[in-house]
UniProtKB/Swiss-Prot annotation:
This is Large ribosomal subunit protein bL28. It comes from the Bacteria. Keywords: Ribonucleoprotein, Ribosomal protein. GO terms for molecular function: structural constituent of ribosome. PANTHER family: 39S RIBOSOMAL PROTEIN L28, MITOCHONDRIAL (PTHR13528), LARGE RIBOSOMAL SUBUNIT PROTEIN BL28M (PTHR13528:SF2). GO terms for biological process: translation. InterPro entries: Ribosomal_bL28, Ribosomal_bL28/bL31-like_sf, Ribosomal_bL28_bact-type, Ribosomal_bL28_sf. Belongs to the bacterial ribosomal protein bL28 family. Coiled coil: none annotated. One of its GO terms (cellular component) is cytosolic large ribosomal subunit. It comes from Ralstonia pickettii (strain 12J).
Amino acid sequence: MARVCQVTGKAPMVGNNVSHANNKTKRRFLPNLQNRRFWVESENRWVSLRVSNAGLRLIDKKGIDEVLVDLRARGEV
């Protein structure tokens, strides 16, 4: 399973570790992904999503029903 948020599309990005001596080595910044179940009242069922913390805040703001409409329009769920 890819490390991608199903709501926001956040994915790992690449950067550098920088030491005190300014040596640089490649590293990955991973999104803060959580596996969460959401109760969808309109469908009377649970929906499991792999979402980032930013995605959880978006669901709190817009509501799970509106987020699912957007996901289905993109063809993700």
